[in-house]
Amino acid sequence: MIKKTIKCFSVILLACTVMFVNDYALHADNAQNWYCKREKEHLRPCIDPTMSYIEEENGFFIGKDPDEKVIYLTFDAGYENGNIARILDTLKAHNAEGAFFILENLIRRNPELVGRMKTEGHLVCNHTAKHKDMTKLSEKEIEQELCSLETLYKETFGEDLAHFYRPPEGRFDRKSLDTVRKLGYHTAFWSLAYADWDNNKQPDPAKAKKLLCDHVHNGAVILLHPTSKTNADILDDLLTEWENQGYRFGSLLEFTEKA
């Protein structure tokens, strides 16, 4: 009797282990890191077909009209190191709107900068409260990450966050995007970015400017980190160059407009 019980327990334990491993593998396979291959001659990039479902979940990465010379400036701002104010000054000088995807930390430590973003006409958007990997969270935990930032922003500034979301580190899956969509968000990916995030290994300004100018394209959603000294140094020249090429700086709100 004891042997039979142990045998049954072992079978059940094995079955549960297999189910757990299969579920974990399936979940891991579904999780993806966003990327967009840069194209030459200012051509608009395409995305991997396995990522095309983002549109079904209120996601976007590039402007709708391939013939319109428009650029969307977006910034992932988790903290301040002296460069965000410089970025804001440059945007103001060019009357260019940006979308800032912020974390809880920035509101708590630098509310004056977030206030500037708001009062100077930029969109203040949701990059989650604590920059967690959303593909590893439950629906309830995802909701908590977004809604706690919403609440803090509302309590601090008396207004609602713009309902645009950017997944931390570009990590996503259908489940997380679907949860975000149900909360009323559009997920903003990007069509042009470069390695600007490491403050201890900043890109050469001339090379960074050339890369961005060589690969800009109609409808570009550009991701920049406003903590980057390189970005703060070159942004004025970039905006001037793009203006001279006939680009306008658009608002992410255009992505929510009906055709």
Annotate each predicted stretch with a short phrase:
Residues I2-T74, Y79-A93, K207, L238-E241, ...:
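N-terminal pre-catalytic segment of deacetylase/amide-hydrolase enzymes
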Residues S10-L14, E39, M134, D173, ...:
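Enrichment for repetitive, rod-forming helical segments
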Residues E68-I71, N81-N83, I87-L88, K92-L223, ...:
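Metal-dependent polysaccharide deacetylase catalytic core of the NodB/CE4 family, i.e.
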Residues H217-L253:
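Catalytic grooves of carbohydrate-active enzymes
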